[in-house]
Amino acid sequence: MRLEHAWDRLRPRLDAGRIVLGITGPPAAGKSTVAEQVHGWSIAAGIPAVVVPMDGYHLAQAVLDARSWADVKGAPHTFDAAGYADLLRRVRTQAASDSTVWAPRFDRSLEDPIAGAIAVAPDDRLIITEGNYLLLEQDPWRAVRACLDECWYLELPDGVRRERLTRRHQDFGRSPQEAAHRALGTDEVNARLVAASRRAADVVIRAD
């Protein structure tokens, strides 16, 4: 399905109240870009919306270093999945009379999450959350899917995905050799894990 068609399908449901939309797919599938695109369409339609990325629930770099997990940063066990699910439950049940819910965001310059950086207001009708493991069928990630009203899976050719990943790692300061090693190593393992969850998506979008 095209992204525009997925939005047209979702748009009427927002008239009835809040929707928690998940956007998932392997690393470098374009999840953040799509989330921002949908957010823009929602705002343009007069529907208050906010993006709450899964990346805000990365474990702190100090924790990863202490547990020797730094080399596999981005794998499922390097996130606070239970905390992420708790936030989505709060967002899902947030009433008009409730106070703002504060969510963390991941700061690339620090390589660490920052608490209380994203405000989810009671009148936000579309909550967009994006990340690799929204459909992962293992605990504690299983609880995340239960919090989503709908989840879209982004799919793109493996060659394009690997090229994007390699370029991204170089942009973050890795050498070409280090970037390729990461893209074809840990990232590839994670991508296969995410691909196995594709069948649980409500919509599959062919990413550009």
Identify what each model region corresponds to.
Residues V34:
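Hydrophobic positions on the alpha1 helix immediately C-terminal to the Walker A/P-loop
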Residues V50-P53, L59-L110:
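Conserved nucleotide-sensing/catalytic segment adjacent to the nucleotide-binding pocket
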Residues A115-G116, D139-R142, Q170-D208:
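Small-molecule kinase domains that catalyze NTP-dependent phosphoryl transfer to phosphate-bearing small molecules
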